[in-house]
Design a protein with these regions (language model features):
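One-carbon transfer enzymes
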Residues: 1-243
Length: 243
């Protein structure tokens, strides 16, 4: 595995706000664009962060399982789309999402496979965390995460990485560039012809992301994550030591 490089400076104020909010009684919305496996996993383990008030699940796609999940867990369902608008009007989209969140008193966001990139003013008003299918401590020559964006797993495979991992980070406007909170254990990449990218992603979610996300939320809810101990690493067991 590659050695981590020095992490560029991020907005520490966002993390401090998140840490403080999570120790109180945050009103939470989950954002998703896909199947919702991480969203379901987080909701099924909500007893681990009992002070969290889950209010809504938001999506940008009608084909997701968002409505079914919201109905199952008694949450509001928010669907915001922009039919036929080319190019995508990011400001208008997030202004509409923000209106919903303000009305519901949302003050903490959990991103679970949400594919839209929010603008800075939205992120400042509604701070949140995201899980990303790559080890974001691996850096490129510019000091930015080497495997960022929607094709991160594909980039890692093409680069010949022998292991993959997932990272939880503060959401900032730079894609996958926010403060790294935790890194999952590393998953070896099987080498055989029938193993495809989708299968790898599902294995990564099941083996790495599903244990990690609720664990980090539980630690945040109890005030056990401080800026000076980040990033936490499941590989080194310092996550387990806090439980």
């Amino acid at each position: 595995m590659n050695s981590p490089a020095i992490i560029p400076q991020q907005d520490n104020n966002l993390f401090e706000r998140i840490a403080q909010t999570c120790m109180e009684t945050p009103r939470v919305a989950i954002l998703m664009s896909g199947t919702g496996s991480n969203a379901r996993n987080i909701l099924e383990q909500r007893h681990r962060y009992p002070n969290f008030q889950f209010v809504a699940i938001a999506t940008d796609r009608p084909s997701t399982h968002c409505y079914a999940l919201a109905r199952e867990f008694g949450l509001a369902h928010i669907l915001v789309m922009q039919w036929g608008k080319i190019p995508f009007d990011r400001k208008a989209f997030f202004d509409e999402v923000a209106q919903h969140f303000r009305h519901m008193g949302i003050n903490f966001l959990i991103y679970a496979g949400f594919l839209k990139v929010a603008p800075k003013d939205f992120l400042t008003e509604f701070p949140g965390i995201n899980i990303h299918p790559a080890d974001l401590t691996i850096r490129d020559k510019t000091g930015m995460p080497k495997y960022r964006g929607i094709a991160a797993l594909s980039y890692a495979l093409n680069a010949g990485e022998q292991y993959v991992a997932s990272s939880i980070h503060v959401v900032e406007e730079a894609v996958d560039g926010g403060l790294i909170i935790a890194i999952s254990k590393h998953l070896p990449i099987p080498v055989h012809q029938t193993y495809d990218l989708r299968e790898l992603h599902e294995d990564l979610k099941r083996t790495c992301e599903h244990p990690l996300y609720p664990q980090v939320l539980a630690l945040l809810s109890r005030g056990q994550i401080a800026r000076d101990i980040l990033p936490l690493r499941a590989e080194y067991r310092n996550l387990d030591e806090l439980i």
